Amino acid sequence: MVRLFYFILLNFLILNFTNAKDISIGENLNLEFICELEKKIIKNSEYNYKTFLAEELNIKNLDSFQIYSNKPSTLMVNGLSKFLSQNSNLDVKIVNKDVVLFKAFNNEKTYSESAIITRKSGELIHEITKNINTDNSEKDISIYICKNKSKNA
């Protein structure tokens, strides 16, 4: 039930911030997590939001997922995906005492990645959307449980 709430919250926040650049960095962070994949939800031409447990997939866990933020506007993420690690222009950057939320688009606005991590529970939801604004858009939603390797949580 909690996961469903965060999934709905993530989609709500993403939909509300799609057309605007939103930056709210309220915390200075330097965090590193080890994250274990719990499940993946896939929506494409073959699957309509089908859920796969981690044991059913051949996907590596995240050995080093890093978040760095510095007030008022710096947020960098590394280790979640190549796209996010190489993208310094995140469209949405929100950091507060409870969550870290971020989203980035490619230049053509046909591909996006977003994620939200709840700092207290360590739950991470990572969403990849391909073919945005087409009839055959695809979503890949990964849900991880993360453990903090750093002390400044």
Feature-to-residue mapping (PLM):
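Contiguous, well-ordered beta-strand patches that form the walls/edges
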Residues: N70-I117
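A short, solvent-exposed beta-edge/loop patch
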Residues: K109-N131
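Short, hydrophobic/aromatic-rich segments at coil-to-beta transitions
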Residues: I25-I34, I94-F105, G122-I125
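Edge beta-strand at a domain terminus
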Residues: I128-A153
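N-terminal glycine/threonine-rich, aromatic-flanked beta-hairpin/loop signature
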Residues: K50-N87, E123-K130
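Tryptophan-anchored aromatic micro-motifs
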Residues: S24-Y49, C146
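Classical Sec-dependent N-terminal signal peptides that target proteins to the secretory pathway
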Residues: M1-I25
